[in-house]
């Protein structure tokens, strides 16, 4: 195995300095002011009493399926000191202005509120949380919150060895370290930075300080590090590690792609061939990991099966992004800005109502989307995990399937990198014009939807940065008579049997003028019927597929791709809709695109009509079409 020499060095390095501490909690010296052992025993009895006589869990943190959310993940920063290839472009990503990020006091205010309502575990994430200057102070102040039992941290390990002693003294009692390879050269290739030995020093320091287990997160990618599976497992023989193998989220385009993704069952089979005595360990109801142990080994391994076997039914997690948005589901499409309400002077009761409403809308699984395996890329580094960006476009865009929608945060932090904007420009549907040439910002939140792989979420990236190449405008050759009427004036379906099959693409648009009241409710996802934009996109996709049943003389077309894109325009209180369809065949797909856009617009109307009847559906029109005997068309 290629990784063996480096693996041996790694294991020797870790073993040579490990102290063999076996306590289940971090080993720390008593600090001044700490209670004596008898007092601690008294506290334990009190804790036992409180557990036996606990009040009902907070209704604000309990969703409609009875899940009690006692685990909060807080992103301390969007910044990272690595540039992992599967995470972000080498130049990084645009960041939120500092003024829009949560301050330390705001973080602690929200943490205090959640802990008061029943959260007993907080994990600090990023970006990379250890590059935040006041991270030790934050941990210390969180440690003072009554009722908070666990303070954890997920880190890339670069700064861990230097900061961990102070963090432990401040109250940090759980550490997860990300490491995808045991080969130094491969590490540098993956993260585009040096630092492998710093990460190993961090793992060693965590073991030395008595953290047990030290959790090591490894994203397994076919063709990159799956050959190191056994080496990672072997580390647990003499070290108190919990090596957690994470299924790679295969965002190579928009389809479920097994080429890079290594499933949990495949990994398990590989490991069992080497260690047939591998035993399954019991797990907590809310655990995301399937734990295993090899008899006689000091550590264990786990699998996080977010792709092949979801764990939504027992989810107890909530997330707060670095800019203060509450996410109730990692794969969900709605965020609520707690920062804005805090800064507007909301009371604790008002904040709890906002939080409770968001938790109450949480779906049964994966934000109500059919299956995570059918979903495409979504930005994640800004909610505490990695942003999956592909280095090259898929071979054929026509292979894309539609994607259930995502709500986008307005800030520039979610704008596409120049690299992805370039891919969008070169490989999007030919000649499709952007809906708007202007930024829709003006200080109000913007929600952005698309079924393309990680499309731009800030309107300026949809303008000059991703404009399609110039193309001839105006109609191409046209017929001088109606094609669906015979010589006697009767309706007649065109015979397309003799026409050649060519690639056909059409883009249509529509606009819904909502008015300020309905627009605000849609923008904040507060409609009683639910998320208007999500439902509208689904309706648009469905309508495209049913066009031949709605338009009497329209041929049935086997569509290879449908995209419905919705964007909020705060300057006009409008929803802008763009629908595109692609197929290969003897007839065009203009009607499919127009029907899709129109139905999406009508669905927005239906979702909002209880709020206002003064809603206008307008500008339903063809934007462009390519393929066919009459040539291409691009609206000027």
Curated annotation (Swiss-Prot):
One of its GO terms (cellular component) is cytosol. The modification Phosphoserine is found at residue 64. Residues 414-636 are annotated as: Molybdenum cofactor biosynthesis protein C. The keyword Phosphoprotein applies. SUPFAM superfamilies: Molybdenum cofactor biosynthesis protein C, MoaC, Radical SAM enzymes. Binds 2 [4Fe-4S] clusters. Binds 1 [4Fe-4S] cluster coordinated with 3 cysteines and an exchangeable S-adenosyl-L-methionine and 1 [4Fe-4S] cluster coordinated with 3 cysteines and the GTP-derived substrate. GTP binds at residues 73, 123, 154, 215, 317-319. One of its GO terms (molecular function) is 4 iron, 4 sulfur cluster binding. InterPro entries: Aldolase_TIM, Elp3/MiaA/NifB-like_rSAM, MoaA, MoaA_NifB_PqqE_Fe-S-bd_CS, MoaA_twitch, MoaC, MoaC_bact/euk, MoaC_sf. Its EC number is 4.1.99.22, 4.6.1.17. The active site is at residue 606. Residues 64-279 form the Radical SAM core domain. The modification N6-acetyllysine is found at residues 198, 528. GO terms for biological process: Mo-molybdopterin cofactor biosynthetic process; molybdopterin cofactor biosynthetic process. It catalyses: GTP + AH2 + S-adenosyl-L-methionine = (8S)-3',8-cyclo-7,8-dihydroguanosine 5'-triphosphate + 5'-deoxyadenosine + L-methionine + A + H(+); (8S)-3',8-cyclo-7,8-dihydroguanosine 5'-triphosphate = cyclic pyranopterin phosphate + diphosphate. The keyword Nucleus does not apply. Pathway: Cofactor biosynthesis; molybdopterin biosynthesis. S-adenosyl-L-methionine binds at residues 86, 127, 178, 249. Keywords: 4Fe-4S, Acetylation, GTP-binding, Iron, Iron-sulfur, Lyase, Metal-binding, Molybdenum cofactor biosynthesis, Nucleotide-binding, Phosphoprotein, S-adenosyl-L-methionine. Isoform Mocs1a and isoform Mocs1b probably form a complex that catalyzes the conversion of 5'-GTP to cyclic pyranopterin monophosphate (cPMP). Mocs1a catalyzes the cyclization of GTP to (8S)-3',8-cyclo-7,8-dihydroguanosine 5'-triphosphate and Mocs1b catalyzes the subsequent conversion of (8S)-3',8-cyclo-7,8-dihydroguanosine 5'-triphosphate to cPMP. NCBIfam families: moaA, moaC, PRK09364.1. PANTHER family: MOLYBDENUM COFACTOR BIOSYNTHESIS PROTEIN 1 (PTHR22960:SF0), MOLYBDOPTERIN COFACTOR SYNTHESIS PROTEIN A (PTHR22960). This is Molybdenum cofactor biosynthesis protein 1.
């Amino acid at each position: 195995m290629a990784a063996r020499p480096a693996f041996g060095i790694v294991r020797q390095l870790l073993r040579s300095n490990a102290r063999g501490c076996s306590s289940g909690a971090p080993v720390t010296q008593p600090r001044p002011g700490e209670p004596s052992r008898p007092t601690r025993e008294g506290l334990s009895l009190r804790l036992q009493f409180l557990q036996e006589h606990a009040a009902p869990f907070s209704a604000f943190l309990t969703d409609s399926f009875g899940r009690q959310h006692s685990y909060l993940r807080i992103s301390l920063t969007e910044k990272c000191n690595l540039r992992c290839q599967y995470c972000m472009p080498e130049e990084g990503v645009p960041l939120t202005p500092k003024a829009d990020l949560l301050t330390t006091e705001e973080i602690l205010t929200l943490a205090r509120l959640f802990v008061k309502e029943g959260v007993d575990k907080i994990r600090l994430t990023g970006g990379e949380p250890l590059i935040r200057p006041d991270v030790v102070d934050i941990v210390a102040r969180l440690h003072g919150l009554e009722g908070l039992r666990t303070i954890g941290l997920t880190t890339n390990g670069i700064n861990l060895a230097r900061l961990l002693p102070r963090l432990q003294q401040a109250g940090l009692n759980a550490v997860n370290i990300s490491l995808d390879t045991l080969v130094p050269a491969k590490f540098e290739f993956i993260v585009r930075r040096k630092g492998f030995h710093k990460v190993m020093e961090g793992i060693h320091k965590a073991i030395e300080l008595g953290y047990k287990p030290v959790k090591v997160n490894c994203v397994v990618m076919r063709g990159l590090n799956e050959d190191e599976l056994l080496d990672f497992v072997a580390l647990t023989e003499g070290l108190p590690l919990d090596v957690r193998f994470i299924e790679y989220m295969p965002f190579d385009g928009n389809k479920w792609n097994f080429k890079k993704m290594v499933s949990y069952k495949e990994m398990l089979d590989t490991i069992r061939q080497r260690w047939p005595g591998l035993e399954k360990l019991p797990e907590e109801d809310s655990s995301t990991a399937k734990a295993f142990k090899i008899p006689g080994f000091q550590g264990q391994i786990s699998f996080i099966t977010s792709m092949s076997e979801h764990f939504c039914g027992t989810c107890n997690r909530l997330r707060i992004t670095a800019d203060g948005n509450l996410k109730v589901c990692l794969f969900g499409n709605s965020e609520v800005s707690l920062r804005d309400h805090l800064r507007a002077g909301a009371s604790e009761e008002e904040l709890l109502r906002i939080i409770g409403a968001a938790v109450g809308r949480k779906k049964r699984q994966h934000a109500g989307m059919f299956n995570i395996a059918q979903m495409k890329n979504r930005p994640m580094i800004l909610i505490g995990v990695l942003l999956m960006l592909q280095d090259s476009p898929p071979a054929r865009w026509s292979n894309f399937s539609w994607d259930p929608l995502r709500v986008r945060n307005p800030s520039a932090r979610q704008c596409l990198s120049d690299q992805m904007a370039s891919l969008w420009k070169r490989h999007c549907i030919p000649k499709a014009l952007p809906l708007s040439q202007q930024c829709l910002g003006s200080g109000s939140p913007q929600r952005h939807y698309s079924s393309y792989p990680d499309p731009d979420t800030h309107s300026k990236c949809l303008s000059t940065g991703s404009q399609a190449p110039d193309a001839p405008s105006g109609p191409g050759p046209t017929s001088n008579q109606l094609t669906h009427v015979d010589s006697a004036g009767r309706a007649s379906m065109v015979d397309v049997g003799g026409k050649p099959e060519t690639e056909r693409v059409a883009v249509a648009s529509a606009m819904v003028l909502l008015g300020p009241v309905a627009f605000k409710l849609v923008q904040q996802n507060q409609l009683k019927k639910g998320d208007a934009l999500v439902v509208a996109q689904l309706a648009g996709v469905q309508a495209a597929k049913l066009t031949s049943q709605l338009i009497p003389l329209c041929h049935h077309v086997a569509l290879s791709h449908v995209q419905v894109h919705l964007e909020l325009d705060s300057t006009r209180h409008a929803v802008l809709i763009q629908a595109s369809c692609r197929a290969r065949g003897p007839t065009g797909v203009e009607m499919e695109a127009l029907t899709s856009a129109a139905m999406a617009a009508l669905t927005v109307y239906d979702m909002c009509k209880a709020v206002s009847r003064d809603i206008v559906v307008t500008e339903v029109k063809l934007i462009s079409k390519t393929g066919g005997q009459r040539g291409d068309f691009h609206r000027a």
